[in-house]
Swiss-Prot record:
Residues 164-183 bind DNA. Sigma factors are initiation factors that promote the attachment of RNA polymerase to specific initiation sites and are then released. Extracytoplasmic function (ECF) sigma factors are held in an inactive form by an anti-sigma factor until released by regulated intramembrane proteolysis. A motif (Polymerase core binding) lies at residues 62-65. PANTHER family: ECF RNA POLYMERASE SIGMA FACTOR SIGK (PTHR43133:SF66), RNA POLYMERASE ECF-TYPE SIGMA FACTO (PTHR43133). Belongs to the sigma-70 factor family. ECF subfamily. GO terms for molecular function: DNA binding; sigma factor activity. Residues 142-191 are annotated as: Sigma-70 factor domain-4. InterPro entries: RNA_pol_sigma-70-like, RNA_pol_sigma-70_dom, RNA_pol_sigma70_r2, RNA_pol_sigma70_r4, RNA_pol_sigma_r2, RNA_pol_sigma_r3/r4-like, WH-like_DNA-bd_sf. This is ECF RNA polymerase sigma factor SigK. Extracytoplasmic function (ECF) sigma factors are held in an inactive form by an anti-sigma factor until released by regulated intramembrane proteolysis (RIP). RIP occurs when an extracytoplasmic signal triggers a concerted proteolytic cascade to transmit information and elicit cellular responses. The membrane-spanning anti-sigma factor is first cut extracytoplasmically (site-1 protease, S1P), then within the membrane itself (site-2 protease, S2P, Rip1), while cytoplasmic proteases finish degrading the regulatory protein, liberating SigK. The gene is sigK. Keywords: DNA-binding, Sigma factor, Transcription, Transcription regulation. The sigma-70 factor domain-2 mediates sequence-specific interaction with the -10 element in promoter DNA, and plays an important role in melting the double-stranded DNA and the formation of the transcription bubble. The sigma-70 factor domain-2 mediates interaction with the RNA polymerase subunits RpoB and RpoC.
Amino acid sequence: MTASVLVGAAARLPLVTAELDALLRQVAQRDAEAFAAFYDQTRARVYGLITRVLRDPGYSEETTQDVYLQVWRNAAGYDPSVGSALSWLLTLAHRRAVDRVRSEQAASTRESRYGAISVDPPSDHVADDVLLDDERRRVAGCLDSLTDVQRECIQLAYYDGLTYAQVADRLAANLATIKSRMRDGIRALRKCLGVA
């Protein structure tokens, strides 16, 4: 790099910082256009940071989405006297990624412990089969009571083993929409099955 390029980049840095600070203050006022501009200018850095921590593209996409949702909800909590908008955002992203790693590790540890200490007692296979058949019929009946889009989302996720992001890709729908359909569908299934 030449010295003039470095000087030009250094001169642009305060402008970018000031621009992001201004955009984040507008986001705090629920300005959707400012949020879109803030997202466009920062998404690559946020996703890159999260991917370096998580090392999984699917979790990274989901965590990035969570970070920007948190930005939208908590932009008013940004204090420019403490640091720049970019450092606030990257700190938020790093914390969220580390939380995700800890959560996954805790879940893995719980599963390992449970698997190590749980021993299946002898059972009556005929009675178990009858109960399973009855439960399958109840679940199938309750699935039929869902809307077509809810049923399709649940079948893709639970019967075909797809992640929410893969379901969104398959159905060409927004991930937030898929999550909403899944939540509503599961709620309806619980109600139908009499599960709290």
